[in-house]
Amino acid sequence: MASNNLNVLNALDTAHTQWYHVTAVVIAGMGFFTDAYDLFCISTISKLLGRLYYYDPHTHAPGKLPHTVNNWVTGVALVGTLTGQLVFGWLGDKLGRKKVYGLTLILMVICALSSGLSFGYSRKVVIGTLCFFRFWLGFGIGGDYPLSATIMSEYANKRTRGAFIAAVFAMQGVGIIFAGLVLMTVSKVFLMRYAGKAFSTDEVFSTEPEADYVWRIVLMLGALPALLTYYWRMKMPETGRYTAIIEGNAKQAAIDMGKVLEIEIQAEGEKLAKFKSANDYSLLSNEFFQRHGLHLIGTMSTWFLLDIAFYSQNLTQKDIFPTMGLVSDAKSISALREMFETSRAMFVIALLGTFPGYWFTVFFIEKIGRFKIQLMGFFMMSIFMAIIGVRYDYLKTKDHKWTFAALYGLTFFFANSGPNSTTFVLPAELFPTRVRSTCHALSAASGKAGAMVSAFGVQQYTQDGEVHKIKKAMLFLAFTNMVGFCCTFLVTETKGRSLEEISGEDENQNETKMKGRPVSGGHQDDGWD
């Protein structure tokens, strides 16, 4: 059937992959680079902060952040991210994607630098100031989620759209690798010059005074990538879909996208008026609920469930690694040595499990499809977490630490090659232009709500490192993944279709309309029957 789409939208959908697609991935991905860098670093830094600021000589044990303080240090950025997602997602639909896009990077740069400058006359002031700036860092990072996903989906062609959106998200993998290298390099440099004694030998000076500079340098370096891409982000034009469909300026959309694609595009004023009038419904309307209600429930629920498991893995790595035997006992090493060993273990797990998973999705999402990849990821994560939970006593012994590490790494691989990527991609494709950024924001905010369950619930539960608690936590995470597997059936496959065809905006077949067919069967659309 012939498409009712505008010329400018058809040109975007059928364009060959060009250099601007690659530059858009890098420019849009810097927020996720910073997000992953911060998440990776803070888990390790929180242990160092405990040794620096919370040493109690009466306990004869290395300093450790109190549960509540640790939860806020690691979790406050998640609260900021959730808030930023909702605010900037809504602004992206109301004011335009580009108008608020630069502000997110400015927030990231300022707050990353300020986090490293969290000085004070007491530990309460230092931690309080750090949490304040980490909230606003998260606020900026959160704004990048809906804006970057929406911009990339509206720029890309329909044949490779999923791969490019996934590539934006895969910049998290690059951020993780960079964070690991920075942590290891900075801590090693200070170790070479200021190495302290083991805690068992000297309780006070096993925590090197110079270590107070280490965590500050690491946090401040997170501002560098965002700063380097600010100029190029400001040079990007507004997306053709927003300019044409929302602003109603077909001529400007044709000019902007013509420059990007290096072709001439004819504007269609009369056709645009009909196009706009057929799709003028709001997020809270019955029309939206009939077309996309279950899809929104599906994207929100799967992201929520995924992030409970995913952030629990990331935030509790520092506690699980000693049990796995990948990090020395805290009493046998100095503070900087502990930081180096923890970051090294996290780096190896990320390099072998997390990083390949992101790029597996980039290369195979257009071949396998979003729906199948998400189902596979949830299912395999559940299996491996259940094995760890059931056999934890066996796996935690020294003789089986590498089996433990392999199983733990595989959960990261299938998270990133599955739902961690697809839950980001699908909300950028399923919903109409008028509410695309807002719907992605709602889905992403649900994910961060799950991450907060992890930070303030699962992490606190396992912080003591007690075996029976870690076993129960892993089995709980296995269960949440199976629920995510079931909720995946609420979304539909989007592979190979234009955004307007998926959302029904071009009025061809209104394929996502749900009257008389509650689930627009991802399994049916994807040929599973």
Curated annotation (Swiss-Prot):
**PROSITE patterns per the UniProt record, alphabetical:** MFS
Biological process terms from the Gene Ontology for this record are: phosphate ion transport; response to symbiotic fungus
Key words of the record:
Cell membrane, Glycoprotein, Membrane, Phosphate transport, Symport, Transmembrane, Transmembrane helix, Transport
Stated membrane topology is: Multi-pass membrane protein
GO CC term (a single one): plasma membrane
Transport as a keyword of this entry, yes or no, is: yes
Glycosylation site positions: N314, N510
Residues on the Cytoplasmic side?
1-21, 93-99, 146-163, 233-291, 366-374, 427-472
* Miscellaneous remark of the record: Although related to the sugar transporter family, it does not transport sugars.
Summarize the protein's role. Low-affinity transporter for external inorganic phosphate (Pi) probably involved in the acquisition of phosphate released by arbuscular mycorrhizal (AM) fungi during AM symbiosis.
Q: What is this protein called?
A: Low affinity inorganic phosphate transporter 5
Query: By which gene is this protein encoded?
Result: PT5
